[in-house]
Amino acid sequence: MLGRCFPPDTKEKQQLRMTKLCDPAESELSPFLITLILAVLLAEYLIGIIANGFIMAIHAAEWVQNKAVSTSGRILVFLSVSRIALQSLMMLEITISSTSLSFYSEDAVYYAFKISFIFLNFCSLWFAAWLSFFYFVKIANFSYPLFLKLRWRITGLIPWLLWLSVFISFSHSMFCINICTVYCNNSFPIHSSNSTKKTYLSEINVVGLAFFFNLGIVTPLIMFILTATLLILSLKRHTLHMGSNATGSNDPSMEAHMGAIKAISYFLILYIFNAVALFIYLSNMFDINSLWNNLCQIIMAAYPASHSILLIQDNPGLRRAWKRLQLRLHLYPKEWTL
C-alpha cells in the first residue's frame, strides 16, 4: 500500500507528479491463483469481522449494563474495534482497487486508505501489546517493589495508555505519508529487440523508514515479547512450586494461569508472524502483485481473525456467550416454523 507508481518527473511537471499514474504492474500470478488469493482474503476478513464483532458486543453490553467494564474488557474493546475497522478497510480497499482502479488511484482516495491502514495497524499492535502487558502485571508472580507498585496502579494507567497509543499511532501515520514512492521507467530496452520494458524503481527515505518501523512495529513487538516471556517464566516457576507442594493440577488458580499462558503463547506466535509480514509489506521489498506480497497480505488478514477465535475459545465468559449464541441460532429456525 505504501508504494504507488508515478511517471518520471521533469522539472516543468514536478507539481503534477502526484496525479499522473503509471499503468498497473504486470501480475506474475495466474488468473486462477489471483482468484484463489482474493477468495481467501475475503474469507479471512469476514471471519475476523464476525469474531471481533462478537467480542466487542459482549464487552460493550457489559459496559452498558453495569456502567463499568473490567480492565481486560476495556483493552479487548479497543482491540476489537481497531481490528474490525482494519479488516473492513482492507476488504473495502481490495474491492475498490479490483473494480475501480482509476478511482482508487486518485490522490485523496489513495492517501486516505494509506493513512488509515497504517494508523489501524499500529493501533492494533499497541493494543495487543498492552493486553500482554496487563496479563503479565496481573498474573506474573514477582515480589519486586516496583512491580508490586505497578500492579496496584495498572487499572488506572491502562485507559491513559490506550488513548496515548491512539495518539502515537495517528501522529506516526501522518508522519509516514511520503516514506516510499515507486516510479516507473518505460524506456528500459530489451536485448535483441526494438521494444522497451516497463520497470519500477523505489525511492525510500531511509531515516524516515527506520523511525517508522522502530516506533510503530518494533517497539510494541519488543514489549510484547518481553512481557509474554516473563509471564511464561513466572508460570513455570509457579507450576514447579505447586508440584513440590503436591497441590495438584486441578487448582482453579493454576488452571486460570495456564489458560492465560496458553492464549498468550499462541498470540505470541501470531503476533510475530503478523509483525514480520507487516514489516515486509510496508517495506516494498517485493513487487505489488508478487506471490510474496500477496502472502504477506494473507498473513496480515489471518492474524486478527485467528487470534480473536483463540480469545473466544480460551476465555470462559466469551466461550459461554458463544455457546449461548449458537444455541439461539440453532433454535431460531424452529421457533420461526412454529
From Swiss-Prot:
UniProt entry keywords in alphabetical sequence: G-protein coupled receptor, Glycoprotein, Membrane, Receptor, Sensory transduction, Taste, Transducer, Transmembrane, Transmembrane helix
Superkingdom classification of source: Eukaryota
Keyword Transmembrane: yes
Gene Ontology molecular functions: bitter taste receptor activity; G protein-coupled receptor activity
Tissue-level expression: Expressed in subsets of taste receptor cells of the tongue and exclusively in gustducin-positive cells.
Ranges facing Cytoplasmic side: 52-74, 138-156, 227-262, 313-338
GO biological process: detection of chemical stimulus involved in sensory perception of bitter taste
Major location (coarse): membrane
CDD domains: 7tm_TAS2R39
Transmembrane segments: 31-51, 75-95, 117-137, 157-177, 206-226, 263-283, 292-312
Record bears the keyword Transmembrane: yes
Topology relative to the membrane: Multi-pass membrane protein
SUPFAM superfamilies: Family A G protein-coupled receptor-like (SSF81321)
Extracellular side: 1-30, 96-116, 178-205, 284-291
Compartmental location: Membrane
GO cellular component, one term: plasma membrane
Glycan-carrying positions: 185, 194
Family: Belongs to the G-protein coupled receptor T2R family.
Note: Most taste cells may be activated by a limited number of bitter compounds; individual taste cells can discriminate among bitter stimuli.
Record's function text: Receptor that may play a role in the perception of bitterness and is gustducin-linked. May play a role in sensing the chemical composition of the gastrointestinal content. The activity of this receptor may stimulate alpha gustducin, mediate PLC-beta-2 activation and lead to the gating of TRPM5.
Official protein name in the record: Taste receptor type 2 member 39
Organism in which the protein naturally occurs: Homo sapiens
